[in-house]
Amino acid sequence: MTLSFVTRWRDELPETYTALSPTPLNNARLIWHNTELANTLSIPSSLFKNGAGVWGGEALLPGMSPLAQVYSGHQFGVWAGQLGDGRGILLGEQLLADGTTMDWHLKGAGLTPYSRMGDGRAVLRSTIRESLASEAMHYLGIPTTRALSIVTSDSPVYRETAEPGAMLMRVAPSHLRFGHFEHFYYRRESEKVRQLADFAIRHYWSHLADDEDKYRLWFSDVVARTASLIAQWQTVGFAHGVMNTDNMSLLGLTLDYGPFGFLDDYEPGFICNHSDHQGRYSFDNQPAVALWNLQRLAQTLSPFVAVDALNEALDSYQQVLLTHYGERMRQKLGFMTEQKEDNALLNELFSLMARERSDYTRTFRMLSLTEQHSAASPLRDEFIDRAAFDDWFARYRGRLQQDEVSDSERQQLMQSVNPALVLRNWLAQRAIEAAEKGDMTELHRLHEALRNPFSDRDDDYVSRPPDWGKRLEVSCSS
């Protein structure tokens, strides 16, 4: 089957990119590819059998027209000016059978006009982390970019130390970022901001294209998508780590995996990025930061969208987020209905978990095994203050009994939303260290495990992290 590529970005947004081709690595070789995703995209298996090829920037497929996009943004709350694809190249937009498109974005593809002081490269460590994280999030049901392939090489790339240079093929329906809009707004080119909005509506919100109120309705949906995404992050204990406006997806996708982390111990103020000295992007601050970022996006639209309409959309953010978050947390607790005491029970559990530094994922997974007519709980032994847990658990059991559903029905619901497996940093690190020594077994094994996060396991993927695996410091260097 021949793959078809279109050039919508190149043709319709001519001042938003620089056309250029990838710069190959030395002795590049394919070490992993996503068979399931490749099948979904109807990619012939033969493309993965002939060396690095397109996956390593050594070849282009017919119809591809590579380019690097320009955008700007606020980083850690401060205007950073022009940024752009400093090491990534959009190879092409694949046209799928249903008429939608999928960007093929090659990360680590070499220098671009937007590389600034960088070298245009990515390292094996960061490409493995992004591939694992994006696929983990996908199988958790959270909107995200996807990973299609990883190529490693003999080219040294210098970060804190010399590391193997690598490339990641990332795919997504669009790489539109808040920062694209900021770039032209701060250049006082509001007509180009409008062109970006029209492009987005035409291709991703086409049902609004002929509506006279299209900009307000579109921005309201961007707000809702962002609120829903952040709510989902919070329910699984995911910390992004670097929520700059240039890392915010217009489509509400999880984008740009850098120093991310899933909670081990329940620590509301968890900071996964060791460069975040003020905790701006801490776990519990993510909802507020996302709203701040949406406000920056709204500002770029103010020359052609009424400020009252923008503020009305922004005002809906909190309620949308709380609605999504509340619904999912009730499911995690096994509540089939909504009762007035639900929030208090959840907050008391969180307080108990924070005091005891309980493991976030294990606590909710073990709670899924609760039998409402049994005073015993498999979770009890996880707590030192048994009296405090017993007091909470007695009230929790009483709340479960209000719903009048069987244990099996409730447990089935809980186990479908409380994962047994998340991508803890130590699991990723173990796969990385093996891969850097040339052993890809753990990389493939972990990828396979992450496809079934809600299935019980009896291996160390679902155990508490070892001492060395706690509080692993992760930087933005990639």
Swiss-Prot record:
Disulfide bonds join 272-476. The active site is at residue 246. Changing residue 130 to A: Loss of AMPylation activity. The keyword Kinase does not apply. Disruption phenotype: Moderate decrease in global protein S-glutathionylation. GO terms for biological process: protein adenylylation. ATP binds at residues 84, 86-87, 107, 119-120, 170, 177, 256. This is Protein nucleotidyltransferase SelO. PANTHER family: PROTEIN ADENYLYLTRANSFERASE SELO, MITOCHONDRIAL. It is an enzyme of class 2 (transferase). Auto-AMPylated. Is probably auto-AMPylated on Ser-477 and/or Ser-478. Mg(2+) binds at residues 247, 256. Its cofactor is Mg(2+); Mn(2+). Auto-AMPylation inhibits the UMPylation of chaperones. AMPylation activity is activated in reducing conditions. Under non-reducing conditions, the formation of an intramolecular disulfide bond between Cys-272 and Cys-476 reduces the AMPylation activity. Shows a preference for UTP over ATP in the presence of Mn(2+). The UMPylation activity depends on Mn(2+). Changing residue 246 to A/N: Loss of AMPylation activity. It comes from the Bacteria. Belongs to the SELO family. Changing residue 247 to A: Loss of AMPylation activity. GO terms for molecular function: AMPylase activity; ATP binding; magnesium ion binding. Its EC number is 2.7.7.-, 2.7.7.108. Keywords: ATP-binding, Disulfide bond, Magnesium, Manganese, Metal-binding, Nucleotide-binding, Nucleotidyltransferase, Stress response, Transferase. It catalyses: L-seryl-[protein] + ATP = 3-O-(5'-adenylyl)-L-seryl-[protein] + diphosphate; L-threonyl-[protein] + ATP = 3-O-(5'-adenylyl)-L-threonyl-[protein] + diphosphate; L-tyrosyl-[protein] + ATP = O-(5'-adenylyl)-L-tyrosyl-[protein] + diphosphate; L-histidyl-[protein] + UTP = N(tele)-(5'-uridylyl)-L-histidyl-[protein] + diphosphate. InterPro entries: adnlytase_SelO, SelO. Nucleotidyltransferase involved in the post-translational modification of proteins. It can catalyze the addition of adenosine monophosphate (AMP) or uridine monophosphate (UMP) to a protein, resulting in modifications known as AMPylation and UMPylation. It could be involved in stress resistance and play a crucial role in regulating essential bacterial processes, including flagella synthesis and iron uptake. The keyword Metal-binding applies.
